Amino acid sequence: MPATDRFSDRATLARSVRLLTAFRFEQSAPDRFYGALADDTVAMVGDLWESATGESQAGLTLLDVGGGPGYFASAFTAAGVNYIGVEPDPREMHAAAALTHERAGTFVRASGTALPFADDSVDVCLSSNVAEHVAQPWRLGDEMLRVTRPGGLAVLSYTVWLGPFGGHEMGLTHYLGGRRAAEMYTRRHGHRPKNDYGSSLFAVHARDGLRWAQGTGALLAAFPRYHPRWAWGLTKVPGLREFLVSNLVLVLRPC
């Protein structure tokens, strides 16, 4: 059974509109946005796992590289997953402790490019919207594959630089160049953007992720995370995919 069979049924236009609507509340009502994204991610990973293995994700050990402030921890724990979050930023870890209250899951302070876990030690390794924030995204990808057991899944999802959300809070000014966009943001707001080009935000392209994933020999599927199923073919069109695939999901299964 292809790894995306179940999830493709979920990837409807209504879902895309719902997530796009929630995106508007990222700054003003983060619980609304990140809660919706976390629930959708749990469903996506569950669908991918069930299609690949025929089993439920309940009881799995999942390592989330870049776990953030705890929304994913709560959602995966509620689904019966043994959640481990890796987060290099202590501020995010403190936010996670406050958000999850009962400390859903386990959090480890570490870098995604040097994971402090043994080879083949987790069932699923997930990274959601992190690769564009590290200078060596494919080293992160290699680490994800290293810690994922044979027959498990590594799911790497990242924001494509030339897509409409590539500039993050800098908006569409990133089409004028990343450094210029950061300077424009600084002049407008009086401070550097949180996602500052060249230090905490990097230009990661769809072609780069596909080339890396294909080179591993473990690629099961690649698709646009937020698009309806009928638009997934964009991933196969060079050039066009850089602008229209706003977020690329790479699903890998180490042997």
Curated annotation (Swiss-Prot):
Molecular function terms from GO: S-adenosylmethionine-dependent methyltransferase activity
A GO biological-process term: methylation
Keywords: Methyltransferase, Transferase
Protein name in the entry: Uncharacterized methyltransferase Mvan_0241
PANTHER family: 2-METHOXY-6-POLYPRENYL-1,4-BENZOQUINOL METHYLASE, MITOCHONDRIAL (PTHR43591:SF24), METHYLTRANSFERASE (PTHR43591)
Domain of life: Bacteria
Main EC class the enzyme belongs to: transferase
Keyword field contains Transport: no
This protein's record includes keyword Phosphoprotein: no
Family assignment from sequence similarity: Belongs to the methyltransferase superfamily.
EC numbers, comma separated: 2.1.1.-
